[in-house]
Amino acid sequence: MSKLFSTVNSARHSVPLGGMRDYVHIKKLEMNTVLGPDSWNQLMPQKCLLSLDMGTDFSKSAATDDLKYSLNYAVISRDLTNFVSKKKNWGSVSNLAKSVSQFVMDKYSGVECLNLEVQADTTHIRSDHISCIIQQERGNPESQEFDVVRISELKMLTLIGVFTFERLKKQYVTLDIKLPWPKKAELPPPVQSIIDNVVKFVEESNFKTVEALVESVSAVIAHNEYFQKFPDSPLVVKVLKLNAITATEGVGVSCIREPREIAMVNIPYLSSIHESSDIKFQLSSSQNTPIEGKNTWKRAFLAFGSNIGDRFKHIQMALQLLSREKTVKLRNISSIFESEPMYFKDQTPFMNGCVEVETLLTPSELLKLCKKIEYEELQRVKHFDNGPRTIDLDIVMFLNSAGEDIIVNEPDLNIPHPRMLERTFVLEPLCELISPVHLHPVTAEPIVDHLKQLYDKQHDEDTLWKLVPLPYRSGVEPRFLKFKTATKLDEFTGETNRITVSPTYIMAIFNATPDSFSDGGEHFADIESQLNDIIKLCKDALYLHESVIIDVGGCSTRPNSIQASEEEEIRRSIPLIKAIRESTELPQDKVILSIDTYRSNVAKEAIKVGVDIINDISGGLFDSNMFAVIAENPEICYILSHTRGDISTMNRLAHYENFALGDSIQQEFVHNTDIQQLDDLKDKTVLIRNVGQEIGERYIKAIDNGVKRWQILIDPGLGFAKTWKQNLQIIRHIPILKNYSFTMNSNNSQVYVNLRNMPVLLGPSRKKFIGHITKDVDAKQRDFATGAVVASCIGFGSDMVRVHDVKNCSKSIKLADAIYKGLE
């Protein structure tokens, strides 16, 4: 401890590393790069300064006056500039410093030891600069236990002092904090959250002595979850009072403490900070935005949750009761998520979501309506706070007719909800409904950034399951398709990404047709023969998977095919679906039935005989009544696919240079970042953004017709209005599609469309683009290659894959889940 921190405290290079006496220095090499969010929480380039002290032996260079025996600081400076510029976002000063130090030690064998400091001045608005100091010694990785992250000149106002005049007015103090970054720790200390916690603590507390202040700040930092894992890490905290003695720039004290020392110490005011609830905000008592009366339509966002009985039915009933009110209109409903209970853990998992409503009610009147639905209509019994409940309806945000956030601070109602920023099960569904630029009215930060901050903590209880309801079956528990998405650290880039970590669903193709492109006539037989084939198919799939989706088709949808009549399609498919559902030889709790149809009447008949999923290759484009049928059955899953034209014209419509929605699009986002800030992505993503916009347009029509978001999966339509190269590009760009959103003008109002959390189905099986690459003219010869493509689809984020060769592709899926998701 003393070696490292004496180096840091006195001067960066005051203690020679590795016994070296010769050094080459580069002082404050200036460059601009993105270091994660800046002072204004924007991903903009920041100026950073790199200083290097490189221990070497230049005796030979000094004797010969020949540069080749020395470290060329001009070349090193150029190489460092090039190295830093190659990455779009380093994420933090610490990540940049760690990467630069490794780069220097790997590239320049003449560097025997290194002392590196990376400094940035605009990382946090409260601090003059944040820096990271890395020390390395070649051949002796254990020479130092810690690197250091330094927070300099952290400015705050607080009450401090023993004199009466000091107790009446807050005064400025600055803190210098040195955070140890253990060499064995993969991640650096969480600088942003530590600063926020320290600032909140100091500014909401008061002290008589600087000694109490510095000790308490050390305790606040020590109680951070990060340092609980490293109890022997030395924390250095220095405080200066800037106005105590006017003839000085400041007076104060400093201390070095280890978390284990502070754990048993009772620090005053520490109860005001608690890591589990992070930073709570106090709502202003003043209200600058007027609350309009009953004659004006306003907007509100309500969070709903249930964990008693039939949770989904309770949620449906609550939404129906809201919609029956003349003063309330349901505008948009989020996906449904399952979450582990917070606070009181010993209870059933919750089912959660958010709904956006238009209302003539005031906030207090809307609260009364919510309580009426909870306690009178659905008979909620509240035994204690945060306990089980049949239904919970909370007002999360309230906006006036101009779209301005309303702040309410009353004994029985706080808006925005004071604990919403602690809960992914509120923020995740809410962020499906609001634009990434929507600011929290109190913190003035984008709400989506608060969600990211929760996920970055990597707490298991913040991980959610997306649920897609399936119809109720007699004797079977309520059924759902389940998709688990988690934030994972990329061990190579150091960045966090949202990826699906639940098993991929296998959808087995069963074409009861004489003319499908690869298996026409194969299952075009009597019901008994078809059922035997289904039983074998299920056995093959369930050997490795918990469930299987059987996708029955009664009409070929291959491009340019002659379409069977509606009556013929019904004759081929409906009796078969009925037989499958009634079969006692099939494990009905593991068999999910789908019908591949674009006709609403066929879908309606299939629902009557037990189908769970409507797989519509047209996305409602071929039959205007399809959405009405889906809306009438809110427990039916609907796969909304992308195509253009019709069966006979789609192959001529694979040109995507111009955006179909044109000027109606106002703003586009990828991973919640405005596309205008992503110059390197704009030209490369024209195809997938076109597909995303056209899926979004059909999504809007579905929602306008009463379809619920929780019903919808999306399929970008491989092979439909796509060239072979475009099919490959779509597979590669699935991560963009799953994180694509946009705002657009629709019916004289602004609509936000968000594809986040939409499970994606891909159907590459035996398709022509595979044969184009493998030279397999016969579609049936493409099964082996299909297995490889299926694995790639999963690697790029597909949640469900549609295949012909169930037995072998089920193995490909299982392997891909193990490789890309770490599942066994």
Swiss-Prot record:
The modification Phosphoserine is found at S286. Keywords: Acetylation, ATP-binding, Folate biosynthesis, Kinase, Lyase, Magnesium, Membrane, Metal-binding, Mitochondrion, Multifunctional enzyme, Nucleotide-binding, Phosphoprotein, Transferase. The gene is FOL1. The lineage of its organism: Eukaryota, Fungi, Dikarya, Ascomycota, Saccharomycotina. This is Folic acid synthesis protein FOL1. Catalyzes three sequential steps of tetrahydrofolate biosynthesis. Its EC number is 4.1.2.25, 2.7.6.3, 2.5.1.15. It comes from the Eukaryota. The modification N-acetylserine is found at S2. It is found in: Mitochondrion membrane.
